[in-house]
Swiss-Prot record:
Keywords: ATP-binding, Kinase, Lipid A biosynthesis, Lipid biosynthesis, Lipid metabolism, Nucleotide-binding, Transferase. Its EC number is 2.7.1.130. GO terms for cellular component: plasma membrane. It comes from Caulobacter sp. (strain K31). The gene is lpxK. The keyword GTP-binding does not apply. This is Tetraacyldisaccharide 4'-kinase. It comes from the Bacteria. Belongs to the LpxK family. It catalyses: a lipid A disaccharide + ATP = a lipid IVA + ADP + H(+).
Length: 335
């Protein structure tokens, strides 16, 4: 059974009680030590192409997939043969396999690769090195890897880390800074930052600017600001929303900020599958309010085919505020 991301992970005060902190802290020490040991003992292997890693410091969703999409689009516009690469979380295929939307399903390749494959060459591979090499053999000049900052197997040309820029209502992207499971961090921030070429702070569309206190944490590491913006207006009329992403409450907030008449919202675990019972519950809920159903593109591709006409997917896109700075960063590694 998939578990939802604890909201307290992303609150400044962290765990809701001292007892919870005390119970989880020893497990955090073990997790951090294992991560450090794996990275220290692994010699990265290369592929016959450049590799841009889009990772994160934390467990849970920060908006990597929209950034991966925007980077693939930017590289393609710059004349580069760019392919995407993902582990295929939630899919059963080990790969390496090129994702074909007309043939593959979410159960085989995962939701994010299937979504990205609608627009770009996309590969799924549990072994990132084999996946990157397969992409290179198929003509890729550069591979954009979704996640993998803590995976030392594949040598990176550029390591980018996406940070959720939401800091309102006592939210903080790193919580109280504790490592999983006592907090959201995959490893201590200073350790992870040491392997980072640039940080991408992803802001909600309605947040005026990045929090200076957050930016100060990154020291001399270059920071790019991007915004997660609607690619289309939300559906008109009353709507019941639902989402199964790392931080589903952000979808609810974004829909309301975009002007959606949201009468109810249901959060679900990240990458979870929607069975008939769940979908019937949502449909009946919408009928109670005389409302439609709206969800994210990522959730929509996980719906059974028979349900897709009943649910409106709401697309969002990442936009870099300073495209020149992004271009300079890519040029610095020959891209």
């Amino acid at each position: 059974m998939k578990l939802a991301t604890p909201r307290w992970w992303y609150l400044r005060e962290g765990a809701p009680s001292p007892i919870t902190r005390a119970l989880l802290t020893p497990l955090s020490w073990i997790w951090a030590a294992q991560t450090a040991r794996r990275i220290a003992r692994t010699t990265p292997r290369g592929a016959d192409c450049a590799v841009i890693c889009v990772g994160n410091f934390t467990v849970g969703g920060v908006g990597k997939t929209p950034i991966v999409r925007e980077l693939l689009l930017t590289l393609t516009k710059r004349g580069r043969r760019a392919h995407g690469l993902a582990r295929g979380y939630g899919g059963k295929l080990k790969g390496p396999v090129r994702v074909e939307p007309s043939r593959h399903t979410v159960a085989e390749v995962g939701d994010e690769p299937l979504m990205l494959a609608q627009d770009f060459p996309m590969w799924v591979s549990r072994d990132r090195v084999l996946g990157a090499r397969k992409a290179a053999a198929s003509g890729a000049e550069v591979v954009v890897m979704d996640d993998g900052h803590q995976n030392p197997d594949l040598r990176k040309t550029l390591s980018l880390v996406v940070v959720d820029g939401e800091t309102r209502e006592d939210e903080w992207p790193f919580g109280d800074g504790r490592v999983f499971p006592a907090g959201p961090m995959r490893e201590p921030l200073n350790v992870s930052l040491g392997r980072t070429d640039a940080v991408i702070v992803l802001l909600p569309a309605d947040l005026p600017e990045a929090d200076p206190r957050l930016l100060a944490l990154f020291g001399d590491t270059p920071v790019l600001i991007a915004r997660l913006e609607p690619a289309a207006p939300p559906p008109k009329g009353r709507q019941v929303g639902f989402a199964g992403i790392g931080k589903p409450w952000k979808v609810e907030r974004a829909l309301k900020a975009a002007g959606c008449h949201l009468v109810d919202f249901a959060p679900y675990p990240d990458h979870g599958q929607y069975d008939e019972a769940t979908l019937n519950f949502l449909w009946e809920r919408a009928q109670t309010y005389s409302a439609g159903l709206v969800t994210t593109e990522k959730d929509w591709v996980r719906l059974p085919q028979a349900w897709r006409d009943r649910v409106t997917p709401w697309p969002v896109r990442a936009r870099f505020e300073d495209e020149g700075a992004l271009g300079a960063l890519l040029e610095s590694v020959g891209l």
